[in-house]
Design a protein with these regions (language model features):
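Active-site/acyl-donor-binding loops of N-acyltransferases
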Residues: 2-22, 155-184, 188, 315-380
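Intrinsically disordered, low-complexity proline-rich regions
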Residues: 5-6, 12-15, 89, 106, ...
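A conserved beta-strand-loop-helix scaffold within acyl/acetyltransferase catalytic domains
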Residues: 21-99, 142-172, 176-296
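Residues at the C-termini of beta-strands that transition into short coil/loop
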Residues: 29, 116, 216, 344-347
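Acyl-donor binding region in acyl/amide transferases
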Residues: 71, 85, 92-168, 280-337
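A short, structure-level motif marking secondary-structure boundaries and short turns
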Residues: 111, 185-186, 235, 292-294, ...
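Short secondary-structure junction motifs
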Residues: 135, 207-209, 259, 317, ...
Length: 380
């Protein structure tokens, strides 16, 4: 069992006349056996995004961390209830006093989880609990910069005594479906994109050589996982550093009814695969790959159109999300862009935390000066 090397229980009290304003905070060093109220809080959060759910976090903790990386779960609750008011899944490296949210390169969105209608007090108590454990720094990313929780988190960190700095992570392309059919959506794409898709579909499906398959669960699931793994290893992408994570995610999604795994077969061989996750009205385009030997077939384009039709006309999702990055092809398919940001916070009660904040402040102050100097140098 993974474990944090620090106290697992502590009390955090805000003194006042009303005992309901007293908070108790704790750190659970394992995500594998959570009490039902904790599981319920995480799964309620997962309705907004499946990456906030207990299943996602448990798969990440179990199958996507190095041996020296240790997960945990902070919580705070009011003294008069056993129900958690706020939760923070966390991660740190053995021997380090730098803490971060439980997110990795597999994560497209992270959040502190708050169960109270007025989140500010619960978040401040949560971050006070973390700070009093003596961590030098706390990094939270990627966060939804356009959501209320982002500003609430920044404010709560300050109230809890942290020195907090926001930073940009990446762009995120998405599209509100707005009740359209696939035909209406497709007609709204650029004419060049529409013509390309039609031409490539015709070529791929000609003479019955190309076939498209959708796997959601059932007897084809394990064979589909094997096909995904083989295609990914034959693609241009780097090998998976944690080979158990994707099979674990696929099985989790199949169990929950979230999986939309598309396979493109040509002459009986699987040549392209895409993993889409459909949960609570949202379709996330999570992973895609194709066998480079079959690149001229453009099977990935054909498969994207196939899955777009599925999630719009069959699943009736409200939003489609490309998750991470500003790859040029994403704006061919989806219309809107937003940004994901992070927050880097330092604990001024520790020497290392204070030094980190000083360096952060100095770097931010120097950045515009350096930009102006480079601009002048370029004109010289």
């Amino acid at each position: 069992m993974r474990a944090f090397h620090l106290n697992a229980e502590l009390g955090l009290t805000r003194k006042g006349d009303n005992p309901a304003h007293e908070w108790t905070g704790s750190l659970r060093p394992d995500l594998g056996d959570l009490p039902l109220p904790w599981l319920a809080a995480l799964d309620d959060a997962g309705r907004a995004n499946m990456e906030f759910s207990a299943g996602w976090l448990q798969n990440l903790a179990e199958n996507a961390l190095a041996e020296e990386e240790l997960p945990g779960l902070y919580d705070v609750r009011r003294a008069d209830t056993a129900r958690p008011a706020a939760l923070l899944p966390v991660l740190h490296t053995l021997g380090s006093r730098r803490l971060q949210g439980l997110s990795t390169f597999y994560t497209s969105l992270f959040t502190p989880v708050v169960t109270e209608e007025a989140p500010e007090a619960a978040l401040a108590a949560l971050f006070s609990t973390v700070r009093h454990d003596g961590w030098h720094s706390l990094r939270l990313s990627p966060l939804a910069q356009d959501a209320p929780i982002f500003g609430q988190t920044l404010a709560a960190l300050g109230q809890a005594g942290w020195l907090a700095y926001p930073f940009y992570c990446f762009g995120n392309w998405y599209m509100p479906v707005a009740g359209r059919t696939f035909a209406e959506y497709f007609q709204g794409l650029a004419s060049q994109v529409r013509n390309t898709v039609k031409r490539r579909e015709k070529k791929f499906l000609a003479e019955g050589r190309g076939q498209l398959e959708l796997v959601e669960s059932g007897p084809r699931l394990e064979a589909a996982i094997e096909s995904w793994d083989r295609i990914y290893r034959s693609s241009w992408k780097k090998p998976e550093p944690f080979p158990r994570f994707m099979p674990g995610l696929i099985r989790l999604c199949a169990e929950r009814g979230w999986l939309r795994l598309g396979l493109a077969h040509y002459d009986g061989e699987a040549v392209a695969a895409q993993i889409w996750i459909v949960s609570h009205g949202r379709a996330a385009i999570y992973k895609l790959a194709y066998d480079e030997r079959f690149a001229p077939l453009s099977a990935g384009t054909v498969l994207t159109a196939f899955l777009m039709r599925q999630v719009i006309d069959v699943d009736h999702v409200e939003e489609i999300d490309y998750l991470i990055g500003d790859d040029a092809y994403k704006k061919d398919w989806l219309s809107h862009r937003r940004e994901r940001w992070g927050i880097m916070a330092y604990n001024p009660a520790t020497a290392a935390g204070l030094l980190g904040a000083a360096r952060e402040s100095a770097g931010r102050a120097l950045k515009p000066l350096l930009a102006r100097w480079r601009a002048r140098s370029g004109k010289a």
